[in-house]
């Protein structure tokens, strides 16, 4: 039906007859001549229809935006003064000799023009029009290139692409499962997988020592800008390896991806930082290293001060007191400071103390703060020295339980970095390693795994794990790019007794363990090799590589913030006949059509 994509028509095609198919992007009448911009996924091509061919010209006069056409013509150079170097085909045009309308279109709710600002709900309702925009075509094309690059790299590394089940058993992995009722087993349900975690471990025990899969996963949890109920991840597992093997594999993969897609050369070895250091310096386990601001501990300087907010946190074993210096921040107004104070309360902080350094050489007289009356001159001077304050700086303080300080001041650090244009351009990739094996749930005061219950501790003794579980580190690692957690993984437990110990520590007794994970515990007894892996979020990685603000921009048909699809009206009620066949009766407050 066609001989060329639009963008393939160039000066090498001069004087040749070509045929293209696409949409009418624009139609202009100039002096009795009709100019068409024809669009396909490769780009735009200008076609000219002159009035001498009356039959074809009459068809061209009927064309409107988004009509689908087939155009045949002769390629020629554009006249001087009409060359458009902003277009890939801007030095040529096609003199139309044939024209066929393949389909018509009413006036669309919006035109696929990148210059228009379109309401997001409208974009998703008419996603098939939205996806015609050049920016969306480029983003999804880049995503395709990303997936192809990944497959090529892993295939060359002798990995096998193996599919795992979509209908599986519900397991507690930290989020709610999507359940699928079974018609042939009334009253029983499958779960859509949150990840192929257990199946890929079973593949290692089956002798497939290098597995990967670009796989859809499902989590029924609250949405954010970087979350979707269904998402795509690159899933990798390897046997007979250690942490270093995984890190080197991913460093090699990312180096190839960045070079092929962005023409950026990454270092052979990425920087590494312990979880403890990341939380101490940045208040986050996924720090954006492009931001120069850091948290500085000052608890030792304020233990004996008269400001109870500082002193109580400084003397609390689970407390923390930090300073965050904003260079040249004295221009912040009282309203600005109040807004930042309100901002940190979102993360559990009770307020935000600050000191403005108007004139460092003037001593206490050169400082401005409501808390100065509670602090001795010695304590203030020690704080100024610790943060290396300069005239014009403002110093913010966080004092509370450590987890509150980390979350609130880490978020403030990020906000200040963006508000004050402190984020350096470029790319900062980082491994966060040496994660705690467990954390204490603040509500139940029970241990819960930081990653998942199949992660191996660095200390492989079950006795040592039981004696100091909160001090035990895991063989776990996350890859962070520009402040986004792009992937995480670990070395897995391959000894059944150690796996049972971990289950016991997190409150899963032997009976529950066998009910939920009996197949895994059985498999571990039959010669399970040492193994480990990682999963990378394809959506997030594509979002960063395309400089998008949301993963919804790199997913063809995403869900909204309310986990709904305006295009298809999903989710929707099920009919009574279907519910009856599945053996389901809805609660009285829920109605069906």
Swiss-Prot record:
Gene Ontology cellular component list: cytoplasm
Gene Ontology MF terms in the entry: aspartate-tRNA ligase activity; aspartate-tRNA(Asn) ligase activity; ATP binding; nucleic acid binding
Residue ranges, annotated region (Aspartate): 197-200
CDD domains: AspRS_core, EcAspRS_like_N
PROSITE patterns, per database record: AA_TRNA_LIGASE_II (PS50862)
Sites where the protein binds ATP: 219-221, 228, 485, 537-540
Enzyme class: ligase
Compartments, record wording: Cytoplasm
Protein name stated in the entry: Aspartate--tRNA(Asp/Asn) ligase
């Amino acid at each position: 039906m066609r001989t060329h994509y639009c963008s393939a028509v160039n000066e090498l095609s001069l004087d040749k007859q070509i045929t293209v198919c696409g949409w009418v992007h624009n139609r202009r009448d100039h002096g009795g001549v009709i100019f068409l911009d024809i669009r396909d996924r490769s780009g735009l091509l200008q076609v000219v229809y002159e009035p001498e061919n009356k039959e074809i010209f009459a068809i061209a006069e009927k064309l409107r935006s988004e009509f689908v056409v087939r155009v045949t013509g002769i390629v020629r150079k554009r006249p001087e003064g009409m060359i458009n170097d902003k277009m890939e085909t801007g030095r040529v045009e096609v003199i139309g000799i044939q024209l066929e309308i393949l389909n018509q279109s009413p006036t669309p709710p919006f035109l696929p023009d990148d210059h228009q600002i379109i309401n997001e709900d409208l974009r998703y309702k008419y996603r098939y029009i939205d996806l015609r925009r050049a920016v969306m075509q480029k983003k999804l094309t880049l995503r395709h290139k990303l997936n192809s690059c990944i497959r090529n790299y892993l295939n060359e590394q002798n990995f096998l692409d193996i599919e795992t089940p979509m209908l599986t058993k519900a397991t507690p992995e930290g989020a709610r499962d999507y359940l699928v009722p079974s018609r042939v087993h009334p009253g029983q349900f499958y779960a859509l997988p949150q990840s192929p975690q257990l199946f890929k471990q079973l593949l290692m025990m089956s002798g497939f020592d290098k597995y990967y899969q670009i796989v859809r996963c499902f989590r029924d949890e609250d949405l954010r800008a970087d979350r979707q109920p269904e998402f795509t991840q690159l899933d990798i597992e390897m046997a007979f390896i250690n942490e270093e093997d995984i890190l080197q594999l991913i460093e090699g993969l990312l180096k190839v991806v960045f070079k092929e897609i962005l023409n950026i050369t990454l270092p052979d070895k990425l920087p590494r930082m312990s979880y403890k250091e990341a939380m101490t310096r940045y208040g986050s386990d996924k720090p954006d290293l492009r931001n120069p601001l850091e948290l500085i501990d000052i608890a030792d300087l304020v233990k004996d001060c008269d400001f109870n907010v500082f002193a109580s946190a400084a003397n609390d074993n689970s407390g923390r007191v930090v300073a965050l210096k904003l260079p040249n921040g004295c221009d912040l107004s009282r309203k600005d400071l109040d807004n930042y104070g309100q901002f940190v309360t979102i993360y559990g902080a009770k307020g935000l103390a600050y000191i403005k350094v108007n004139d460092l050489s003037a001593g206490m007289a050169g400082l401005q703060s409501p808390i100065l009356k509670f602090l001795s001159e010695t304590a203030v001077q020690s704080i100024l020295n610790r943060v290396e304050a300069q005239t014009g700086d403002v110093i913010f303080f966080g004092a509370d339980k450590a987890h509150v300080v980390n979350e609130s001041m880490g978020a403030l650090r990020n906000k200040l970095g963006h508000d004050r244009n402190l984020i350096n351009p470029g790319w900062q990739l980082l491994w966060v390693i040496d994660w705690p094996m467990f954390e204490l749930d603040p509500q139940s005061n029970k241990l819960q795994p930081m990653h998942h219950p199949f992660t191996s501790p660095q200390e492989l003794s079950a006795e040592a794990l039981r004696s100091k579980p909160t001090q035990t580190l895991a063989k776990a690692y996350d890859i962070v790019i520009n402040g986004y957690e792009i992937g995480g993984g670990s070395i897995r437990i391959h000894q059944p007794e150690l796996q049972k110990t971990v289950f016991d520590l997190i409150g899963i007794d032997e009976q529950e363990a066998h009910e939920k994970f009996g197949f895994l515990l059985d498999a571990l007894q039959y010669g399970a090799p040492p193994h480990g892996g990682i999963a990378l979020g394809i959506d997030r990685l594509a979002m960063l590589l395309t400089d998008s603000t949301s993963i919804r921009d790199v997913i063809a048909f995403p869900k909204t913030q309310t986990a709904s699809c305006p295009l298809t009206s999903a989710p929707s009620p099920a009919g009574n006949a279907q519910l009856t066949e599945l053996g389901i009766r809805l609660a009285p407050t829920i109605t069906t059509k």
